């Protein structure tokens, strides 16, 4: 069996690690995996792909510099020919597609191919995310009537996504699956020792430092807690250069609220084990309807409760005041109240952390179920 894994992004984040974990499972179980990655992939991504057969493609994504619109158009035309010729020559049994954008701009090559198309969906359909009525109106018709029909197997990473896909026009052909993310196995390369001014409960955030992830709201919640005399620290792991203007805004909040002794930015880290061991509670304060985050299952595996907002797909696997805190109100005040709960009830940290770990098995989030489900997707024809 030959599987082409589409990897059209250029750098390593949660979604990319999650897809590479699937490649690893398939390869370990006798499937031949060829990864079609971007010609603009970073050295870090290329290094992660060392153990796979690879093929570079000119994907119309993450292009930078002048004349970007022309570059996108050029690559869109290129990829139609590149992918069509490659699929015709190699005839893979399956193609694993990780994003709706890739599914859309590769529709023509897929349409003329006999390969089984597996779409791993971890985001809201674009028909929900785009605000332009003209775009949404036209695209929703193409999506429902044409693009979705070429998907043979839909793999959703949350019930939330399954429902959204059904609402957008998906009709299950009998092979669609719900597979929650298993935290990708990371290479725990030792970083410098995490330096933290530990003062009370240590909250942690790990991920992309961008507005939708709620880091600003997290710092504002920290400010409220400090004014109220609470003792706590916050450890933030992630690359601040992803959105420099946003990072500058965060630094200003820290300075203006005298949080220098409470907040620690440690940058992008490899040694995630040390990060989780240093933290007591993990904060995942996404302010948009995030379908799922790898960090939820990852925090469970390290016996850590997490704080989330009651939206998107994450409440499916976090039980309020049992394995974490589910905050109904998406607000700074709601977040600060949840954090204050752990500060005032430190015994709950260990208790809920243990329940979080046990819930991995109860919710079938363990690795054996993850492997079995993915192998059932890629069956011999």
Task: List each model region and its residues.
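Short hydrophobic beta-strand element within catalytic cores of glycosyltransferases
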Residues: 305-308, 318
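Short, structured helix-loop element that forms part of the nucleotide-activated donor/catalytic region
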Residues: 43-48, 161, 166-167, 235-260, ...
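A short, active-site helix/loop in glycosyltransferases that binds the activated sugar's phosphate group
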Residues: 149-175, 183
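Conserved acidic donor-binding segment of nucleotide-sugar-dependent glycosyltransferases
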Residues: 320-321, 325-332, 341-346
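Conserved donor-binding/catalytic core segment of Leloir-type glycosyltransferases
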Residues: 4, 195-213, 219-222, 235
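Nucleotide-sugar donor phosphate/pyrophosphate-binding loop at the beta->alpha transition
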Residues: 75-79, 116, 125-150, 163, ...
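Short His-centered aromatic/hydrophobic patch
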Residues: 79, 97-103, 121
């Amino acid at each position: 069996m030959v599987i082409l894994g589409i990897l059209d992004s250029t750098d390593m984040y949660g979604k990319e690690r999650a897809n590479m974990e699937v490649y690893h499972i398939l390869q370990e179980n006798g499937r031949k995996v060829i990864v079609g990655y971007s010609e603009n992939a970073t050295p870090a991504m290329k290094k992660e792909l060392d153990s796979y057969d690879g093929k570079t493609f000119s994907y119309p994504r993450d292009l930078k510099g002048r004349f970007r619109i022309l570059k996108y158009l050029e690559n869109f035309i290129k990829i139609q020919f590149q992918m069509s010729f490659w699929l015709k020559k190699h005839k893979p049994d399956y193609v694993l597609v990780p994003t709706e954008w890739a599914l859309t701009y590769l529709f023509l090559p897929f349409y003329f191919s006999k390969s089984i198309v597996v779409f791993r969906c971890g985001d809201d359909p674009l028909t929900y995310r785009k605000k332009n009525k003209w775009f949404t109106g036209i695209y929703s018709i193409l999506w429902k009537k044409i693009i979705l029909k070429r998907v043979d197997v839909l793999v959703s990473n949350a019930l939330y996504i399954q429902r959204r896909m059904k609402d957008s026009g998906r009709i299950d052909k009998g092979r669609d699956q719900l597979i929650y993310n298993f935290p990708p196995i990371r290479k725990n390369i030792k970083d410098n020792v995490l330096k933290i001014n530990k003062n009370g409960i240590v909250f942690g955030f790990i991920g992309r430092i961008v507005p939708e992830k709620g880091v600003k709201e997290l710092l504002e919640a920290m400010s409220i807690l400090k004014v109220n005399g609470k003792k706590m620290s916050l450890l933030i792991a992630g690359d601040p250069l992803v959105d420099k203007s946003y990072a500058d805004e965060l630094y200003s909040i820290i300075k203006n609220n005298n949080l220098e002794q409470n907040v620690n930015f440690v940058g992008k880290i490899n040694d995630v084990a040390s990060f989780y061991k240093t933290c007591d509670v993990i904060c995942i304060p996404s302010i948009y309807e995030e379908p799922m985050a790898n960090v939820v299952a990852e925090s469970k595996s390290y016996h850590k409760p997490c704080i989330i907002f009651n939206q998107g797909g994450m409440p499916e696997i976090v039980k309020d005041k049992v394995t974490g805190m589910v905050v109904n109100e998406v607000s700074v005040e709601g977040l600060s109240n949840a954090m204050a709960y752990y500060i005032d009830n430190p015994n709950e940290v260990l208790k809920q952390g243990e329940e979080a770990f046990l819930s991995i098995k109860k919710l079938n989030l363990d690795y054996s179920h993850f492997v079995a489900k993915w192998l059932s997707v890629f069956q011999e024809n």
